[in-house]
Design a protein with these regions (language model features):
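A broad, structural surface signal
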Residues: 109, 230, 306-309
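Charge-enriched, short contiguous segments at helix-coil
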Residues: 71, 76-87, 93-99, 264-318
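Helix-loop junctions and short alpha-helical segments
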Residues: 126-265
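Intrinsic-disorder-associated interaction segments
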Residues: 93, 97-100, 104, 172-175, ...
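Long, hydrophobic, amphipathic alpha-helical segments used as structural scaffolds
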Residues: 112-126, 232-236, 240, 289-293, ...
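Long, contiguous, compositionally biased segments that the model treats as domain-scale units
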Residues: 1-130
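Alpha-helical structural motif
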Residues: 107, 201, 247, 251-258, ...
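General structural signal for secondary-structure boundaries
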Residues: 89, 93-96, 119, 180-181, ...
């Protein structure tokens, strides 16, 4: 057993009343009970003394006082302040460190979303992406963990969590843009027409995966897929001079019935086993709130993308 501390640099400051100053709160990260400690307001405060660089607050346990801007006081003597960083403390085994590092992005995303919901400010920017540390090795999600040992300097624990694989591939001429493709990209960017909704939703879904928000990714991608399927079926009705699209659509609500509608019309579906690869992933997520893992979500999104690309060749609105 050992004692560990971590410094969590917040993506966005948390605004607090004076009663929160110096307080500690418990949470569970990867099955480990972690204490999150807030910095303290000084007993006396002169707004002209402390700089914005060093901050106004006193570090928990008086660690990293000079190296970290823990937060700023906004109103005195009311003691309204904002926090930039928190100190994390727990007792445990060194083997638990990597599991905490691995689970922290999920925990942080959930925490940030709870703050967003509680504040009602849904326009807040997204959390910062991970970075690779230039000094000290490892990756950085906003949390750095150190081991406390008596009469020894702090020992930094490297974040060696596994990242989602980055595909490295040799570039062939077929993958490179020719002059007509580049010209079309610039023309489309300057067009008054917007990108169609299925592609915009698909982009949002992929971004949700990056944030480990797998449920949102699956549900958003399903909405994109429904839009694309309906657009393809409507085009079939127009091409065959059929006038009952709106009536028939009311009989084929929900994604599963829309796939059956494609089969009824003889429209090819690019993903042959769509029941297993798409519906069996989307339905329990949407209806029962089940959470998928990275691999199943990534495979699901790729299958959704295949269908959307086949059914929506025109990227811009008509």
């Amino acid at each position: 057993m050992g004692k560990f501390i971590g410094v969590w640099k917040l993506d966005k400051p948390i605004y607090c009343k004076k009663e929160v100053s110096g307080r500690c709160f418990q949470s569970n990260v990867s099955g480990v009970s972690v204490t999150f400690c807030f910095p303290s307001c000084p007993e006396t405060y002169n707004g002209g003394v402390n700089s914005l660089t060093k901050g106004d607050l006193i570090a928990p346990l008086n660690v990293f006082q000079e190296q970290i801007n823990w937060g700023i006081i906004h109103a005195w003597p009311d003691g309204l302040f904002s926090v930039n960083s928190l100190l994390c403390i727990w007792d445990g085994e060194e083997s638990e460190v990597q599991s905490i590092y691995a689970d922290f992005p999920r925990w942080k995303e959930k925490f940030n979303n709870l703050v967003l919901i509680d504040s009602g400010n849904f326009t807040q920017p997204e959390q910062k992406p991970i970075t690779l540390l230039q000094n000290g090795n490892g990756v950085y999600d906003g949390l750095e963990i150190f081991m406390l040992e008596e009469d020894k300097p702090l020992k930094r624990e490297v974040n060696n969590r596994e990242l989602e694989p980055i595909t490295v591939q040799l570039i062939s001429s077929e993958q490179c843009y020719d002059i007509e493709t580049v010209r079309a990209l610039f023309e489309n960017a300057g067009s008054q027409k917007e990108i169609i909704l299925p592609y915009e939703l698909l982009i949002v879904a992929y971004r949700a995966v990056i944030k480990h928000d797998f449920r949102s990714a699956i549900i958003i991608a399903a909405t994109a897929l429904e839009k694309s399927i309906l657009n393809r079926i409507q085009r079939y009705y127009i091409d065959n001079q059929l006038t009952t699209f709106e009536t028939d659509k009311r009989q084929h609500k929900m994604l599963g019935k829309e796939f059956r509608w494609l089969n009824e019309l003889g429209i090819a579906i690019p993903v042959q086993d769509y029941q297993t690869e798409i519906l069996d992933v989307r339905n329990p997520t949407a209806h029962e709130g089940r959470t998928q893992n990275y691999n199943s979500t990534a495979r699901y999104l790729e299958n959704c993308k295949l269908i959307i690309q086949a059914y929506s060749p025109n990227v811009l609105e008509e």
